[in-house]
Amino acid sequence: MQSIFGTDGIRGRFNEEITYSLAYKVGYALGSTLENKNPILIGRDTRISGNILLQAITQGINESGKKFINLGICPTPAIPYLIKEENLSSGIMISASHNPPEYNGIKIFDHNGQKITKIFENKIQKIIEESKQNISIPTKVVPLKANKDLMDTYIKSLIQTMDGESLSGLRIILDTCYGSATTCARKIFQSLGADVKVINNSKNGLKINLNCGSTNLEPLKKAIRESPADMGFSFDGDADRVIGIDSKGNVLDGDHILFLWGRELMEQKLLTNNLLISTEMANLGFENSWKKIGGILYRTDVGDKYVHDAIKKKRSVLGGEQSGHILSKINNFSGDGILTALQISKYCKKKNINLNDWLKSSFEPFPQKLTNIKLGFNFNKLNPENKILIDESIKNFQTIYSENCRVYIRPSGTEPVMRVLVEAKNHEKVDSLSSEITNKLFLEIDKIRY
């Protein structure tokens, strides 16, 4: 059996890759594996399938002899924070993050609030493989009561990260993309004194991430044009990532956030070895500018768990991804979009600078082009010979690397596509190189018989 775990837990379309039976087995396997007898914390985003999967997982946990606490709809980072705070045995988040509504997923956290290790994944996988049960969706799904007190504990923890700094006088627009941030983003920013407007703020599992949120910034840009604001923040479905927009509609992505936040820490002598951790997707303009001010950028494979591992290994205090996953020491390196948005707002208020001017002081990004080549098959399921052939082609293309040009190619961890990233100092070079590489790689992939 192929591993059910990808780069960020278990992910797939509901009733296809992610079934009621699989969710039940995950709950049972987790409960059976844990020696710690404290309850398992469970949360979910707003997807329609979330409540059904919650029912399945809790059924499995119950039959394993363990107990659970239902947090209800919540941001993913609430789970790891509360595991540590309440001394719980582990946690599960039911979410497919930024993916469309028909997808869902299962993220598992250990007793330290960290994503489980490969060894732990293998233990769960083994129990699932040995199970012969095929559990069907019950005719009636009974809603489970959510623990509101724990959610309030998480909200208070975010407010406390502001160290008493008020956001009064700041006009901020939030796009909660019909997802997890709908539960608390408005409340948090308003409690800090900000003048807040929120769009896409209903808990709608059919609309989550659809033409909104951190992967589609047009609704937020439009809102800022129509209702002038100092800044805006757009979250993804489970609120573990965020992208900012300044008053002029310019984008503050994860690279800009890392540069600006990192520079603040560097100036305060709080950035260990002047080191930032990011991934192979980080913009070359970011890397070059960071080096010019004395910083070091360490790149990892794509995925916040790889960033997290490198942060621990290199003893860094800040890292993240261009997509808006930012991991900081403030909350034990758990990506939290609301926390990140609060910190950006706090710096602007303390420095008495608008986000537009602060963003101008960062770096000029190189033009980038990201192309997805549809594979029609799961790359990880290819036979070794064909996989080696494609890997060799990728290596050859990626040798094109200098201060002015870079190519990065990888199979997606969540979709059957090959991602081709090309960046250079001008758009013409990017377009021509991207077209050349994409066409050649497509022909190589098309030769594969699987």
UniProtKB/Swiss-Prot annotation:
InterPro entries (UniProt xref): A-D-PHexomutase_a/b/a-I (IPR005844), A-D-PHexomutase_a/b/a-I/II/III (IPR016055), A-D-PHexomutase_a/b/a-II (IPR005845), A-D-PHexomutase_a/b/a-III (IPR005846), A-D-PHexomutase_C (IPR005843), A-D-PHexomutase_C_sf (IPR036900), A-D-PHexomutase_CS (IPR016066), Alpha-D-phosphohexomutase_SF (IPR005841)
Cystine connections: none
Domain of life of the native organism: Bacteria
UniProt cofactor(s): Mg(2+)
Cofactor binding remark: Binds 1 Mg(2+) ion per subunit.
Active site: 97 (phosphoserine intermediate)
A Pfam family assignment: PGM_PMM_I
Family: Belongs to the phosphohexose mutase family.
Protein name (Swiss-Prot/TrEMBL): Phosphoglucosamine mutase
Taxonomic lineage of the native organism: Bacteria, Bacillati, Cyanobacteriota, Cyanophyceae, Synechococcales
